[in-house]
Amino acid sequence: MSLTPEQVRQVAHLARLKLDEDEMERMRLQLSSILDHIEMLQAIDVTDVPITAQVTDLTNVTRIDAVTSSLPVDAALANAPDRQGDYFRVKAVFEE
């Protein structure tokens, strides 16, 4: 499917793109190629292919959200280069 320069201008306008003539021609060729591939895909008979949302049959594996014991604060902060009370102290990232 070959697009006309006017069709490419319309797409560029809708996408709020400012294209010069060289870019317009390059886009025309690229978009035409993409549409050719889409036409090939549309020609494939998929009537016997089952509808799928995903192909791997994987599901999310989750765990029960339960409170459990964790690492004690002193053990967690044992190798911290700097701490303030029960917290890691780090250099400021944002200015105040």
Swiss-Prot record:
Gene Ontology BP terms: glutaminyl-tRNAGln biosynthesis via transamidation; regulation of translational fidelity; translation
Catalytic activity as recorded in UniProt: L-glutamyl-tRNA(Gln) + L-glutamine + ATP + H2O = L-glutaminyl-tRNA(Gln) + L-glutamate + ADP + phosphate + H(+); L-aspartyl-tRNA(Asn) + L-glutamine + ATP + H2O = L-asparaginyl-tRNA(Asn) + L-glutamate + ADP + phosphate + 2 H(+)
Domain of life (superkingdom): Bacteria
EC nos: 6.3.5.-
An MF annotation (GO) of this entry: asparaginyl-tRNA synthase (glutamine-hydrolyzing) activity
Top EC class for this record: ligase
UniProt KW keywords: ATP-binding, Ligase, Nucleotide-binding, Protein biosynthesis
Protein's UniProt keywords contain Transferase: no
Matching Pfam families: GatC (PF02686)
InterPro entries, alphabetized: Asp/Glu-ADT_sf_sub_c (IPR036113), GatC (IPR003837)
HAMAP family, A to Z: GatC
Protein family (similarity comment): Belongs to the GatC family.
Subunit structure: Heterotrimer of A, B and C subunits.
Annotated function: Allows the formation of correctly charged Asn-tRNA(Asn) or Gln-tRNA(Gln) through the transamidation of misacylated Asp-tRNA(Asn) or Glu-tRNA(Gln) in organisms which lack either or both of asparaginyl-tRNA or glutaminyl-tRNA synthetases. The reaction takes place in the presence of glutamine and ATP through an activated phospho-Asp-tRNA(Asn) or phospho-Glu-tRNA(Gln).
Protein name: Aspartyl/glutamyl-tRNA(Asn/Gln) amidotransferase subunit C
Protein source organism: Herpetosiphon aurantiacus (strain ATCC 23779 / DSM 785 / 114-95)
Source organism phylogeny: Bacteria, Bacillati, Chloroflexota, Chloroflexia, Herpetosiphonales
Gene field: gatC
